[in-house]
């Protein structure tokens, strides 16, 4: 985490093409920001690029485009003590949109420190926020927690604390994301597996409800390539995108300095997602720092849809400098 990260956006044509079959560079998808234009013989005009950074001093961005046509933005605040929310009719409008605090850390006990990586989801007519937090007395005992709000407007109503997401182990865990596929809801997250020679790997489980796992949890990935093990052996920050008969799962790797980067898995949408053998992992990162643009350590991304309702947009955090003083 970093108090000086900035949220940025990119479209498909802003990113270099990666020569790997596992990145699905055919059809209507490409590495980074993906564009889905089914049934169109000629490419649609490309919208103007976004102005970066979109939001300063925020990390781990998440943007939800709601059925009301508005974009809802949340991210890690640099003080790690609250969950914030903004909304706008346009993606660019999030830069200047008013920000509200929808929940604050507890003064003591659980959910009191390291409030990280919130994600806002609309599930079954209610709003949910997944986030990481730790007790005041043990700030690295980080776990995954869930908030629920039944009001149609997430800026109103009451955010009820549904509790901790209980995984197979009581160990360091964070960066939960959720998605549905073929009638089932899944949770994907990062966690330290007892006895493993790494900081965190990626895990997947089906859900009984928005705060409870059900059935087995599987290990999708552990840091194995050199680019996943710089500084720390880390796989974290997963996010899913379903397009063109495949499921793309991006994630972040290595220490959260300028070596931080994005990797990716793909799975056939017709396969069993709970079978690790159905997922293919890219042996190279799909998004890294860039000296030309002076963007370093891109990571913990999400995907949203542009105002045209068709173009997928990659939202990520990065820095404009390499050297870090203090907490990275």
From Swiss-Prot:
GO terms for molecular function: alpha-L-arabinofuranosidase activity. One of its GO terms (biological process) is arabinan catabolic process. It is found in: Secreted. Predicted to be exported by the Tat system. The position of the signal peptide cleavage has been experimentally proven. Residues 1-43 form the signal peptide. Pathway: Glycan metabolism; L-arabinan degradation. The record marks 175 as: Important for catalytic activity, responsible for pKa modulation of the active site Glu and correct orientation of both the proton donor and substrate. The keyword Hydrolase applies. GO terms for cellular component: extracellular region. It catalyses: Hydrolysis of terminal non-reducing alpha-L-arabinofuranoside residues in alpha-L-arabinosides. Optimum temperature is 50 degrees Celsius. The enzyme is inactivated at temperatures above 40 degrees Celsius. Its main location: secreted. Involved in the degradation of arabinan and is a key enzyme in the complete degradation of the plant cell wall. Catalyzes only the cleavage of terminal alpha-(1->5) arabinofuranosyl bonds of arabinan present in the arabinofuranosyl polysaccharides or oligosaccharides. It cannot act on other arabinose-containing polysaccharides and arabinoxylo-oligosaccharides. This is Extracellular exo-alpha-(1->5)-L-arabinofuranosidase. The lineage of its organism: Bacteria, Bacillati, Actinomycetota, Actinomycetes, Kitasatosporales.
């Amino acid at each position: 985490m970093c108090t000086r990260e900035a949220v940025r956006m990119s479209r498909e044509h802003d990113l270099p093409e990666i020569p790997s079959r596992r990145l699905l560079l055919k059809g209507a998808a490409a590495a980074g920001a993906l564009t889905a234009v089914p049934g169109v013989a000629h490419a649609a005009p490309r919208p103007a690029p976004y102005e970066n950074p979109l939001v300063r001093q925020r990390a781990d961005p998440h943007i939800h485009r709601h059925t009301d046509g508005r974009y809802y933005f949340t991210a890690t605040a640099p003080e790690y003590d609250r969950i914030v929310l903004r909304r706008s009719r346009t993606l660019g409008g999030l830069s200047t949109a008013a920000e509200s605090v929808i929940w604050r850390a507890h003064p003591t006990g659980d959910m009191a420190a390291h409030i990280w990586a919130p994600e806002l989801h609309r599930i079954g007519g209610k709003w949910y926020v997944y986030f990481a937090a730790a007790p005041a007395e043990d700030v690295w005992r980080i776990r995954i927690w869930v908030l629920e709000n039944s009001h149609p407007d997430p800026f109103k109503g009451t955010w009820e604390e549904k509790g901790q997401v209980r995984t197979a182990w009581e160990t360091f865990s964070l960066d939960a994301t959720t998605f549905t596929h073929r009638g089932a809801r899944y949770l994907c997250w990062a966690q330290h597996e007892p006895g493993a020679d790494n900081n965190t790997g990626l895990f997947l489980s089906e859900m009984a409800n928005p705060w409870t796992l059900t059935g087995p949890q599987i290990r999708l990935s552990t840091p194995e390539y050199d680019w996943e093990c710089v500084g720390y052996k880390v796989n974290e920050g997963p996010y899913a995108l379903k397009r063109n008969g495949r499921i793309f799962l991006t994630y972040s790797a290595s220490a959260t300095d300028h070596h931080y980067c994005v990797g990716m898995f793909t799975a056939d949408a017709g396969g069993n997602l709970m079978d690790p053998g159905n997922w293919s992992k890219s042996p190279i990162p799909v998004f890294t720092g860039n000296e030309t643009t002076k963007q370093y350590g891109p990571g913990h991304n999400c995907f949203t849809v542009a105002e045209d309702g068709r173009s997928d947009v990659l939202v990520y955090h990065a820095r404009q400098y390499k050297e870090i003083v203090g907490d990275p």
